[in-house]
Amino acid sequence: METKQYPDMECDVVIAGCGVAGLYAALNLPTSMRVIMLSKGAVDECDSMLAQGGICVLPEGSDYDAFFEDTMHAGHYENRRESVDIMIRSSRSVINDLLAMGVDFERKADGSLDFTREGAHSRPRIAFHADITGKEITTKLLQAVRKLDNVQILEHVAMTDILTGERDGATVCTGVVAVPVDEDNSLRPADELANVAEGVHAGELFKIHARHTLWATGGIGGVYDHSTNYPQLTGDACYIAQEHGIKMEHLDYVQIHPTGLFSPQPGRTFLISESCRGEGAILLNAAGERFTDELQPRDVVAAAIREQMKQDGTEHEWLSFAPVECDVVTGHFANIRARCLEDGRDILDEPIPVTPTQHYFMGGVWVDKDGRTSMPELYAAGETACNGVHGKNRLASNSLLESLVWGRRAAWRMRTGESLAVEQAGEPALDGRHRALSADTLAIDDLARAASTQAVEE
């Protein structure tokens, strides 16, 4: 692939990453602000696209305490309580925005949202779209962003460093250094891409000067032999943060998902969603015996599988869909079934081999409740950031929600210099109606208004 060359650029906001955190941040900025977004690979090669199970939401105000406790319990009570509170109370307005952008969540016969349950959840509270929720959400947000004249997306462009300046005696971020990359170079971490000796010509580097910078570069799965992540996610923001003395937190908090589809080959591992176990799928050992409670937190289930593998002397255990109703398998888990059929296994007829696999990074670049890092004018959101909401171990389906909440909060802080107020528990109504956050018009306000008008006309 021949890479495109770019001149130095200027904008109001540069966003490194095109997952849900970056896209939603762009939508929550006014159209008067010029935004440049970078995607290290193709724009659809982000981990947000891979999220299967769903996105958590507070179904009603009475679930607040249970939702809070489930999140804290899964995180071994090492979570930042303020962050957990913000995420939960922000969930309903975020879901309404997604509905307003056309996200097609599953519904009950009466038209209300349907919810599924996953491990360590005390009740169903996860909105979903079959078993490709992340793809549905990310695709709709990307379609919305592509309608904005003020946003420019640069595909196959990697961030290699940040630009800095001085303000009131302090070092501030003033943008990023970037480089066009082909498919092979997209798998390299930032330190290699910035090193001319490693094969990147110095003349290809270019600067993007910006008032505000948002890191939304995803996780670290690319540094593992077996991961559910895209291989170009190589922890670039963490490397750059280390080089500039930017505060990081809990870099050892890496989540291993219990059920990756086993393959002896290196490369990205296909995820078998936790919602499968939430709907009744069970784990079996080599003798066909159930050996653990499948709905415990992820780290507990992963440890149980590893221990059973050690006892059995195997590289995997088995996941059986026998207890799951046939129409749930063919409907809710159609994508998972299709992928397993590629390996010659029909989950309707036989169990599939699963093994614990690197999945998520709870640590990262430290941020506050508004997504601000320790360097002024530098923000981070999504898996790149550590706002403490997940503690030591993430609760299933909190990742998409957290990314969206902090993407929006970062955008608000950039625009106003203030913290975004948080809704009361149980508000607003889950009616799919976008509610403007201020008198100033944001990009999402215009898009939601246009979508509503079109729906009425149709």
What residue spans do the PLM features occupy?
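Core beta-strand elements of the Rossmann-like FAD/NAD(P) dinucleotide-binding domain
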Residues: 8-11, 189, 201-212, 374-377
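Conserved N-terminal glycine-rich FAD pyrophosphate-binding loop of Rossmann-like flavoproteins
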Residues: 41-72, 76, 255-258, 266-270
